[in-house]
A protein has these predicted regions:
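PRPP-associated nucleotide enzymes
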Residues: 1-176
Length: 176
């Protein structure tokens, strides 16, 4: 019902027929040589017949777009576009907004550096550091073989997974 993104694209075949691709992220389209057609609207159903005919129908009364904020902050790849908004651009704007708030509430001379938790926080942290004129540093290395820690069941499982997923680089923390 308009919480999670969904889009579709087409690819014209040599015989003139169209293949369709439905995906939660637009980034899959160019990677598979499909042309992004559009986002699927909240409450909309997309039907593709065996004859490769596609039609769409609104199935919900009063559908509303109520996107999950975590799509832009955490879930989506930075090179995706959701509802016409670049995920990377949204993360940069979050960094700008955070910089404005930090400048209002904190003494900037007390901040040693800006350091993201990889990977999704990186664009916002870079923008924050740039806007405030503060050094940007990488202090954590991510173990790519551990799944998404935010969505794991239970706090104990999340804590254990975070310990396995992130390794601090001691050189960035010594004397701090």
């Amino acid at each position: 019902y308009g919480i999670r993104p969904l889009c579709f694209g087409t690819q014209k075949q040599d015989d003139g027929t169209l293949d369709y691709l439905v995906s939660s992220e637009s980034v899959t389209m160019p990677a598979l040589e499909f042309d992004l057609v559009r986002d699927i609207a909240p409450g909309e159903a997309v039907f593709i017949s065996c004859d490769r005919e596609m039609f769409c129908e609104q199935c919900a009364e009063n559908p509303q777009l109520t996107p999950c904020a975590f799509e832009y902050v955490y879930f989506a790849r930075p090179d995706s576009v959701i509802d016409g908004i670049s995920v990377y651009g949204a993360r940069l704007r979050l960094g700008e907004y955070l910089a404005d708030e930090v400048a209002k509430q904190l003494d900037l001379s007390e901040i040693d550096c800006v350091m993201p938790i990889p990977d999704s926080a990186r664009p916002a942290a870079q923008q924050l550091a740039q806007k405030l004129g503060i050094t940007y540093r990488e202090g954590f290395i991510k173990n790519r073989y551990v799944g998404r820690t935010f969505i794991m069941p239970g706090q104990q499982t999340r804590k254990k997974s975070v310990r396995q997923k992130l390794n601090a680089m001691p050189v960035e923390f010594e004397g701090k």
